Amino acid sequence: MDVMQVVGKSEAEASVLLGQPASCADIHRARLCKYGPHEDEVMFVRDKASMITVQGMDAVAFGADALDALGLATAEPDSADEHAIRWQSIPGLHEVAVFPGPGNSVDFAYIDVGKH
């Protein structure tokens, strides 16, 4: 998923890019929708895509190059350990984090726009 195409989009705009959601639920002051075969999650705050969880990344190696699979340029992480690799210096995003899965792959990625 090219996350920058989805960031800041409305639910209707995200559906054009990702297809119709498999499900949506209202959670507090936000709306959480799941898209595609991996049930990638997009949380809409004030009708803008503010948080994205990308699933189904098991073909991606757990490392700084994982940003490529998200449509982002490779960058030096701000922190990295065996539990997560985090970037807080990507323009337009508050944080990008990838979490390890089995066999040194990425389990999932979390993207926070930070403008709630």
Question: Where are the regions that the model predicts?
Answer:
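Short N-terminal segments immediately surrounding and downstream of signal-peptide cleavage
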Residues: 1-9
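A cross-family detector of function-defining hotspots
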Residues: 9-116
